[in-house]
């Protein structure tokens, strides 16, 4: 008997497609390993995520000046929309064919369909079909408590007979179709995402790096119901579980809260708005024609001053946290919600981007079940490896620093004995000894800093099983 699981895509606006969430359906526990499922969703998102820029505003402008330009623009828009969706379906279908060919030994197949006659991205479903005859595996694991007090179910390590998905990514990097879709995924960033000297290596960067977007907090703006120029900060609740190997949830929330503490503010333009309102009323009475000009200038200057300080502080915070997490391969950046806001350089619709490497082989996978409880699960890909990957790098760096300091200490000790035995040492030898002593002190200072940092990291990761 064949059963099906339907997975809805992430929320998106208009024709944009944001991909699928990597929450694991527990019905597949007997059929498809978690690590393979997450790699499949990664590949599907890589091939299908894209943005669609609508020309509806130009259509409205054309409608003001005449019906004929409006009809021409409408036909052109419908043609572009249909072409966009046809290409999307073609890429999605080719993507799923490659995946199904690769995992046919699992007796699991992936397909998709639109649930409405009008092809809307919000009505798209990813369908997973699997055989129900095979014996069910019971989900067995131990619970751990994260530093944030969250219960995480640790499952047994991933099986050894895993399917290698690297060939899918390699074929994607050499595909011309991917280059076309990458252009449509262009994000307008104020700061560069990656410092690349070779622009021809963009495909490898997309494959080797991931990014997660932290959306602006729009709840206050929605409650007001009016256009609001104030910036209300970022949401700190949507922790991306793919960040587990590079940044803890507590570090993530602490970073976003500091961003909000520094950046959240309100424009003090009450007097300017009152002045503008009074001038508008007088303008209607043909008296305030002269006053409307200074009112508009004051309003524009106040608004420009607000956004200048906002973006300056935002650049400072981005540089600060990029420096903090640079050793883990993480880059912090930001982007605007759409190109118009980017060009105007005065928009509160700002999203933070966290760019991080793909988790290396052997690192654990953090996701959750797609049931009513949304239980977080942690799957080690090697025995007893549940700690985030960056802690291993910190420990390696700590051990390397210890060996370097020990060698410097022995060298300095030998140099001091040689200096005591030689009475005719020249000034060059004295300078060398001073440099060695300075290097020894600097290494000791760096070692103390690294020791404190590693100790704090290990204390943060002290899970209670």
UniProtKB/Swiss-Prot annotation:
Q: What GO cellular component entries does it have?
A: membrane
Q: Region Disordered: which residues?
A: 177-198, 411-449
Q: What is the membrane topology here?
A: Multi-pass membrane protein
Q: Which residues form the signal peptide?
A: none
Q: Print the keywords alphabetically.
A: Membrane, Transmembrane, Transmembrane helix
Which residues form each disulfide bond in the chain? none
Determine if Transmembrane helix is one of this entry's keywords: yes
**Compartmental location:** Membrane
Transmembrane stretches, by residue range? Answer: 56-76, 273-293
Protein's recorded name = Uncharacterized transmembrane protein DDB_G0294619
Q: Which organism is it from?
A: Dictyostelium discoideum
């Amino acid at each position: 008997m064949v059963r099906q699981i339907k997975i809805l895509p992430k929320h998106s606006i208009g024709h944009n497609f944001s991909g699928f969430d990597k929450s694991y359906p527990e019905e597949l526990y007997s059929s498809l390993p978690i690590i393979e499922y997450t790699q499949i969703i990664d590949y599907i998102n890589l091939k299908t995520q894209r943005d669609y820029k609508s020309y509806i505003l130009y259509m409205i402008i054309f409608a003001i000046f005449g019906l004929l330009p409006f009809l021409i623009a409408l036909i052109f828009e419908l043609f572009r929309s249909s072409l966009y969706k046809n290409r999307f379906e073609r890429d999605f279908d080719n993507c799923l064919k490659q995946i199904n060919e690769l995992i046919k030994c699992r007796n699991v197949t992936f397909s998709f369909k639109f649930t409405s006659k009008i092809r809307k991205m919000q009505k798209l479903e990813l369908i997973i079909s699997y055989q129900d005859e095979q014996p069910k595996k019971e989900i067995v694991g131990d619970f751990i408590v994260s530093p944030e007090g969250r219960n995480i179910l640790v499952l047994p390590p991933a099986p050894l007979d895993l399917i290698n998905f690297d060939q899918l990514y390699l074929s994607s990097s050499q595909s011309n179709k991917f280059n076309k879709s990458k252009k449509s995924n262009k994000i307008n960033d104020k700061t560069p995402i990656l410092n690349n000297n070779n622009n021809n290596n963009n495909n490898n960067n997309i494959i080797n790096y991931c990014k997660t977007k932290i959306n602006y907090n729009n709840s206050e703006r929605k409650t007001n119901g009016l256009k609001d120029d104030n910036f209300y900060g970022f949401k700190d609740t949507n922790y991306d579980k793919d960040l587990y190997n590079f940044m803890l949830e507590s570090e993530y929330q602490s970073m976003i809260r500091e961003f909000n503490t520094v950046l959240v503010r309100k424009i003090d333009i009450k007097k300017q708005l009152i002045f503008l309102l009074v001038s508008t009323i007088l303008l209607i009475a043909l008296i305030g024609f002269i006053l409307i000009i200074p009112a508009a200038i004051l309003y524009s200057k106040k608004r420009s001053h607000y956004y200048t300080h906002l973006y300056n502080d935002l650049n400072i915070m981005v540089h600060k946290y990029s420096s903090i997490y640079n050793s883990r391969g993480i880059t912090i950046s930001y982007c605007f919600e759409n190109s118009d806001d980017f060009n105007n350089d005065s928009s509160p619709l700002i999203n933070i981007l966290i760019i991080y490497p793909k988790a290396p082989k052997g690192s654990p996978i953090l996701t959750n079940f797609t049931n009513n409880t949304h239980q977080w699960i942690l799957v080690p890909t090697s025995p007893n490896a549940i700690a985030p990957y960056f802690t291993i790098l910190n420990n390696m760096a700590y051990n390397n620093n210890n060996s370097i300091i020990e060698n410097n200490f022995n060298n300095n000790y030998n140099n001091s004995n040689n200096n005591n035995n030689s009475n005719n040492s020249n000034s060059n030898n004295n300078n060398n000894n001073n440099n060695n002593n300075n290097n020894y002190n600097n290494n000791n200072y760096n070692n103390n800093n690294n020791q404190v940092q590693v100790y704090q990291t290990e204390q943060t990761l002290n899970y209670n099983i």
